[in-house]
Amino acid sequence: MLIPRRVKYRKQHHPKRTGAAKGGTQLAFGDYGIQATEGGYLTNRQIEAARIAMTRYIKRGGKVWINVYPDRPMTKHPAESRMGSGKGTPEWWIANIKPGRVLFELSGVPEDVAREAMRLAIHKLPMKARFISREGGDN
C-alpha cells in the first residue's frame, strides 16, 4: 500500500476539487498513459487495484509508472458514535486528482496490449479517464 512514512500533521483539511491540473498533464516517462478527465479523490487501495490490473494483463512485459501518490489523510468517525467530539481518526490516504492529470504511464508493450491494460485499470478508478499515447495525442 502507498502511505507516507511520516507526516507533519496527522489530520488535514479536505483538498479543493475545483479547477484543472497545473502540472503532470503530459506523458513524462512512458509511451502510453491514463489521463483523468474529471476530478476526485483516489485512495491508496484504488491505485493499487489499478496497478495490479495493468501488470497482470501485460505479464512481465513493459514498465508501469504511477504518477500520483496518496499523501493526504481522510478521517472518519466510528459507526454509531454521537455527533461532535472533534474530528475522527485517519482511516485511509487519498490523492487529490484534478482534470487533465496523468495517473499512470506504461511502455515496452504494443499499443493494443497497452490499450487493453489501461482499459482494465480505468475500470478500477472512481473517475472518468482516457487512454493517451505519445505519438498520436489522445485516442
From Swiss-Prot:
GO biological process assignments: translation
Keyword terms, alphabetized: Ribonucleoprotein, Ribosomal protein, RNA-binding, rRNA-binding, tRNA-binding
- Per its UniProt record, what Gene3D superfamilies does this chain match? Ribosomal protein L10e/L16
Annotated Gene Ontology cellular components are:
cytosolic large ribosomal subunit
Q: What would be an example GO MF term here?
A: rRNA binding
What NCBIfam families would the database entry show?
rplP_bact
Q: Which family does it belong to?
A: Belongs to the universal ribosomal protein uL16 family.
Q: Tell me what this protein is called.
A: Large ribosomal subunit protein uL16
Which species is the source of this protein? Answer: Cutibacterium acnes (strain DSM 16379 / KPA171202)
